[in-house]
Amino acid sequence: MGQNTVKGTDATFSELVGSPLPTLVDFWAEWCGPCKMMDGPLEEIAGDLAGKLQIVKLNVDENPATAMQYGVMSIPTMMIFQAGQEQKRLVGARSKAQLESEVASFVS
């Protein structure tokens, strides 16, 4: 994980998304090219919005229970949570500008 993002696991997921901060969870896998393209933009956004937004990266191969629980069928899938509840789901790679637009209403 980068210095601004948090590694999520099946064991820590509920605690992480229950954070008082809005939380964007990136469901990804090591073998997924589009997932790797998201690393830079997600790390930059996590740094830019530190203290306003938490970004969690969850490897679906290492943590299949959470991916199954939330019905993640393709990756990358990103979900925005507030107080433990899913608020928005984004399937597929996005640019930094697109991601910033998607999270803007949660961090204002």
Which role does the model predict for each range below?
Residues 1-54, 61-108:
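Proteins that catalyze or organize thiol-disulfide redox chemistry
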